[in-house]
């Protein structure tokens, strides 16, 4: 059976609506995103040669990202670091992904003879667009390759679907070229052949398309992709000595570390687990990660699989489509299981679920269509969508506030004269939204040069950073003598960071840091006379200069 599809005009309306919705939702965060890895990327593209940048030779990460690096190089030449241009680009790429996913699913539902195919597909993609889990990918320029990677997968699936409708060789050539490019981008291309295979099996054995078409899909799409994948692994091994890109030794984890993540992601995505109070969230993570929780979850999973196998031939077309989407969720889960699970802050590592979210919400919309009373179905999806939208707006306001503070700190940095600068409490993030952070090489100095366009020859040290919770957070200092001070966070529930992890004691030629309590305070010992330093405290969006002659009281 072949669906009739929708008109080009209706497609244009859907795309424009998705773009406009995404643009409006993320407009508050338009100036955010140029932080942490994004700033490092911008520094690389401005200071490395073309070939060093394209080959990502400075990163130290075992990955082949030449296609991604090349495309970002082109966009940089077009936009420089203009926040409005980059924000529009990221919004547009997400709108394209949402539309492609809608188009593929709508056609899939039509081909399957599912009633209200358009309404189901549009409901699923709207849930995806308004969910709060995708903000990191849309706002943070360093997540460009997630937008690109998912787009490449969707374009290939569209080629396969088109081939089933019209057996033209050009679709196989397009898919092969796209997959070749994707092997030099984000590693989610590992999954593409399996998405292709499951879609091909569905059209052959569920929709009963001719076996000769299925054979050609295997020969012209699936097998060439497997060969390109093997070629990628060979090149990766030859260049870096690793068989798996990017994550390397992260594969060597306890088995339970892998299997506890799927139930946690269900809580995280479907039930907005990240927005639960920390204690409640940890309790849920503990329960689903316990032996009893895992036994229950995987017993349910196995029973569901057994039911699918035993009843598949008797299922309705809608039921079989549910199975296809379910299989795509399982495939998408597989690649993120070795990665760190985001169990603490908001937004942090949400990019890992960008493509998984799409399948989850489309499946949810399809399941909701089983409710016979359409008004109840619409009401439930609307309420659920509005709850998601509420948290998305909340997250985007955090992006906005964090960007305001970061930009103010850069703009209002005092003239250091000829002194050594110590930045005692840089903001690492705002409840998970990345900000500046503390790096050995000097993150603040690099960002100051990039965004204020001034080069300061002085030594500027990122002493430590901390995670902000509110816009007014900061720290205070108690000066003991002319070479020793105690630095304490003003608020509880935050902690000290250094080089992207929990802070620790260290020293260099200009000072020694003694971390007393990673969640509250540290001692700082100066190695030179106090008048050789400019010591700065961050309070909200302001810098405060520490007076080393003012002793016996807290300085805020």
Residue ranges and their predicted role:
Residues 432, 474, 482, 508-509, ...:
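Intrinsic-disorder/low-complexity loop/linker signature
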Residues 443-506:
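Luminal/periplasmic acceptor-recognition loop/helix of membrane-associated glycosyltransferases
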